[in-house]
Amino acid sequence: MPELPEVETVKRGLAPAMEGARVAKLELRRGDLRFPFPDAFADRVSGRTIVSLGRRAKYLLVDLDDGNTLISHLGMSGSFRIEEGRIEEGAGAATPGEFHHARSKDEKHDHVVFHLESPAGPRRVVYNDPRRFGFMDMVGRADLAAHPFFRDLGPEPTGNELGAAYLAERFRHKAQPLKSALLDQKNIAGLGNIYVCEALWRAHLSPIRAAGTLATAGGRPKEQLNLLVASIRDVIADAITAGGSSLRDHIQTDGSLGYFQHSFSVYDREGQACRTPGCGGTVARIVQAGRSTFYCATCQK
């Protein structure tokens, strides 16, 4: 499933094509994805101008000129592609943030098509989703924070609200494993399995230690928590710069691949040498809450 850096890559890839464009027609080729589309969805979007694109956690946000926001989640296999001009079906397409194998480009999985008009000419932005785990919704922009998708989300990992003092208060007295606490979207929004593993390695913290051990009894952060916050920020920033992780043919708008996977220090490196200088340990894989965790037991304590 795409994590925050991959969704941010999608947003940045789509923005030049979609921002300022008018949706001449929203074409729905089926009645649902993971969930049914909102009532009169196509009619409510058609004719509107796209003001801006945004992101909250792992959700793509499309702000419209009538004060509504279209919400899109890519699920397991969703992707958008941009088709420039009046071109042959599938020709000349660019794919900003693709997280599945090339076989998934089969046009029978094209479920939503934005027919756009802009000064640069006509475009189509096509949503393709073979497994249909993605979904779309619509909400008034003023009500976005109260929407069920967002109302319980914690702060963004790169935002000013995230700090050691905040996490110390959230983790205080908790016996929950540290990795599980970091994956809890109520604590931090948008963090996923890959980048939690990488951030914990950078901070030299074990994924299985109790989250509460990083805070004092009075709820103050220990120094290790300051390092963890810095590591989270750094790993997310590095992944966004790299265009995300191409575990399954992730392609950016210009056709280039995300390459952060080449910088993985622990994720998917079971049995390989730890990259911490002088460590000498080996990356291990364990399962926590049904997910693979990769870490070095020698230097992560």
From Swiss-Prot:
DNA binds at H109, R131, K174. A zinc finger (FPG-type) spans 265-301. It comes from the Bacteria. Binds 1 zinc ion per subunit. It catalyses: Hydrolysis of DNA containing ring-opened 7-methylguanine residues, releasing 2,6-diamino-4-hydroxy-5-(N-methyl)formamidopyrimidine; 2'-deoxyribonucleotide-(2'-deoxyribose 5'-phosphate)-2'-deoxyribonucleotide-DNA = a 3'-end 2'-deoxyribonucleotide-(2,3-dehydro-2,3-deoxyribose 5'-phosphate)-DNA + a 5'-end 5'-phospho-2'-deoxyribonucleoside-DNA + H(+). One of its GO terms (molecular function) is 8-oxo-7,8-dihydroguanine DNA N-glycosylase activity. InterPro entries: DNA_glyclase/AP_lyase_DNA-bd, DNA_glyclase_Znf_dom_DNA_BS, Formamido-pyr_DNA_Glyclase, FPG_cat, MutM-like_N-ter, Ribosomal_uS13-like_H2TH, Znf_DNA_glyclase/AP_lyase, Znf_FPG/IleRS. Its cofactor is Zn(2+). SUPFAM superfamilies: Glucocorticoid receptor-like (DNA-binding domain), N-terminal domain of MutM-like DNA repair proteins, S13-like H2TH domain. Pfam families: Fapy_DNA_glyco, H2TH, zf-FPG_IleRS. Keywords: DNA damage, DNA repair, DNA-binding, Glycosidase, Hydrolase, Lyase, Metal-binding, Multifunctional enzyme, Zinc, Zinc-finger. Gene3D superfamilies: 1.10.8.50, MutM-like, N-terminal (3.20.190.10). Involved in base excision repair of DNA damaged by oxidation or by mutagenic agents. Acts as a DNA glycosylase that recognizes and removes damaged bases. Has a preference for oxidized purines, such as 7,8-dihydro-8-oxoguanine (8-oxoG). Has AP (apurinic/apyrimidinic) lyase activity and introduces nicks in the DNA strand. Cleaves the DNA backbone by beta-delta elimination to generate a single-strand break at the site of the removed base with both 3'- and 5'-phosphates. Monomer. Belongs to the FPG family. This is Formamidopyrimidine-DNA glycosylase. The gene is mutM.
